[in-house]
Amino acid sequence: MALSVEEKAQIVAEYQQAAGDTGSPEVQVALLTANINKLQGHFKANEKDHHSRRGLIRMVNQRRKLLDYLKGKDTTRYSALIGRLGLRR
């Protein structure tokens, strides 16, 4: 249940720091958050899909690592990002 090309492009355009920026922590966290939210809906209908659940846990861990990195580098960008995404960290 991956994001479509249009959804990815919209998220990248919304969170990029400069034109063509796809690697900044903000963009990566926003893409992971969108994937995680999409998978949560999948698990409501498919409770026994343990293989995909492993992928979900991996995405959550990767997002946590990126957020920890951003918090250490620039706390104002970190605070702004979790506010925009509605995360509860």
Swiss-Prot record:
Q: Which GO terms describe its biological process?
A: translation
Q: Spell out the GO cellular component terms annotated for this protein, sorted alphabetically and separated by semicolons.
A: cytosolic small ribosomal subunit
- Report keywords, A-Z: Ribonucleoprotein, Ribosomal protein, RNA-binding, rRNA-binding
Chain segments annotated as transmembrane: none
InterPro entries with a match to the protein in the record: Ribosomal_uS15 (IPR000589), Ribosomal_uS15_bac-type (IPR005290), uS15_NS1_RNA-bd_sf (IPR009068)
- Which Gene Ontology terms cover its molecular function? rRNA binding; structural constituent of ribosome
Superkingdom: Bacteria
Query: Entry's CDD domains?
Result: Ribosomal_S15p_S13e
Its biological function? One of the primary rRNA binding proteins, it binds directly to 16S rRNA where it helps nucleate assembly of the platform of the 30S subunit by binding and bridging several RNA helices of the 16S rRNA.
HAMAP family, per database record: Ribosomal_uS15_B (MF_01343_B)
The UniProt similarity line reads: Belongs to the universal ribosomal protein uS15 family.
Quote the subunit structure annotation. Part of the 30S ribosomal subunit. Forms a bridge to the 50S subunit in the 70S ribosome, contacting the 23S rRNA.
Q: What is this protein called?
A: Small ribosomal subunit protein uS15
Q: Which organism does this sequence originate in?
A: Pseudomonas entomophila (strain L48)
Q: What is the lineage of its organism?
A: Bacteria, Pseudomonadati, Pseudomonadota, Gammaproteobacteria, Pseudomonadales
